[in-house]
Amino acid sequence: MSLRDFSVLDWSRMSDGVARRECEALARALPHGLEFEDLKTHDYCGRTHRIAYFDGKEGGDLVQFVLAPGGEVSLGFDGTDFKPSNCQIESFAESATEYDLDPSITQFVDTQTSPRRTACVPPMLIEVVAQEVMPLEPVAEHDAIFARLQDEYPQGRTVEDHGDSLGEDSFIVKRDSDGTLQVSRRPATTLTVVEERLQKWGMRLPTCDEWEHACGAGAATLFRWGDETPIDFYPTDTCAEHRALKTAWVLSGGKLVYEAPAAKWDLHQRLNLFGLKIANNPYQSDLVADGPRALGGDGGCNICGGAGFFLGWLPLATAFRNPYETRIELHQNVADDYHRLRRAISID
């Protein structure tokens, strides 16, 4: 069976020898300079999958894709299937009272996730680690924007000054402990430009269905690892102690020096079953070809807004959809720290 029309079940039944030959043949047919690297068995949260890696070089940097099997798959989530822990129920109840939300955690989850459905998803190659939509460019001290940002951001911290539309670049402003200011420009671009650029490379954005399938890899639970979430820290923290240290750092005006403690829970940071580093930071979302045009986070809204810990983790749910978030417009700037580019390659 050709890789062009195989399903997850077909892939699992294929012998290593046949799988290797098919992947080598696929690599030879690709115009992207990717080479078939290897087959590796990968375990994630009690499930096992054989991953096919395809590697290449771009500007001297390693880029890596994996083969995502397709076929008829189950997507979406039904809130009544969620089995919350007592701690999750308690966390949500506090948030529901504070923000006047539906008091039922399962009903609320149902409104925040895409509906259960069956879809036919084609097999494809998909990038392991999403990249920045546009690379950063250093800004010279004599540039007028350098002086403006130096006056606006005097504190010793790293911030991003965002542009919202084409022509409004974003700037990363970092002041080192010795007072040295570093400014980098992130050129603005739009979804239209991104998709045109990908098309020239023989690549594309994944659709919502493809992204959801690649993220959950068949997991029927709310999150790809299960239903559970930590009860005393957010996805951007390594543990409760780390969260406390970051709060102290903010209160010190960025003067406190500390090292992040070791992670005590990191299922969201591990490669998922298909071998992807995906949906691990609510502040960052992957661009997609349809629907809301970005999945995998909420721009950090729940965390930044001070919502409870369960709501802070919810945007990492495989089928998460924010009903209050507007769809990204084609003319909107997407080259910022909130959006990432995860490229897909069709197997035609």
Protein language model annotation of sequence segments:
Residues 1-16, 109, 132-133, 160-166, ...:
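Disulfide-stabilized, aromatic/cysteine-rich ligand-recognition loop
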Residues 1-51:
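Charged, compositionally biased non-catalytic regions
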Residues 36-107:
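Extended, Lys/Arg-enriched charged tracts that mediate electrostatic binding to polyanionic substrates
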Residues 61, 94-219, 274-275:
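Short aromatic-cysteine micro-motif
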Residues 62-65, 70, 116, 121-123, ...:
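Extracellular structured ligand-interaction cores
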Residues 68, 173, 180, 184-309:
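Functional-site microenvironments in short loops/helix caps that host divalent-cation chemistry
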Residues 78-79, 137-140, 226, 297:
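Short, solvent-exposed loop/turn and secondary-structure capping segments
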Residues 130, 288-291, 347:
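Short beta-strand segments enriched in hydrophobic/aromatic residues
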